[in-house]
Amino acid sequence: GYCQNTELLPRKTGNAIAWKSVIEKLEKRRGLLDAVVFSGGEPTLQPALLPALQEIRDMGFKTGLHSAGMYPARLKKILPLIDWIGFDIKAAKQDYEIITGVKNSGEKAWESARLVIQSGIDYEFRTTVHPHILNSERLTALARELSALGARKYVIQKCNTSHCLDAELKTTSVENSAPPVL
């Protein structure tokens, strides 16, 4: 499969930064920074995300989140604390397992996508395309499904094969394979 942050798999704690240290750095940057974006891996995996978002908001910062939407119940709880979300939508619902290798992952991701749109917060849906996984038919199905859901902001980005976990995909050239025009 593909992951933008393969260095975070498996999840490591050896280089963890104390939350107090993060807050101290942000205190020093008040007036210089507008927002704090929680990224990952998958930030909604972290039980401390909700209180962290609240603390950041209480400091006066806007908040952002990068997510693949795999935990809709957790996402629903934090959406009121989010100003913007970058949402990695990998495929149309019926094609999700092909991309993720995880059964029912499409149901969860698309439920989260629906929650994002219904919330009214600013968002960007994005899909990383590797031509051997997501062909033009699958990409078109994905774009249509997003449109039917009400999505208006969608970005297609080319896969950086150095982040592929699958050795065959890692050695496949995507240089001359721009995503198809929809």
Q: Model regions: which residues?
A:
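Canonical Radical SAM [4Fe-4S] cluster-binding loop centered on the CxxxCxxC motif
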Residues: G1-I17
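Flexible, glycine- and charge-enriched loops at secondary-structure boundaries
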Residues: K12-W19, V102, G106, V174-A178
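Conserved AdoMet/S-adenosylmethionine-binding subsite of the radical SAM
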Residues: S21-A35, T44-L169
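Short, charge-patterned binding micro-sites
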Residues: G41
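Short, basic/aromatic-enriched C-terminal tail that caps enzymatic domains
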Residues: A167-L182
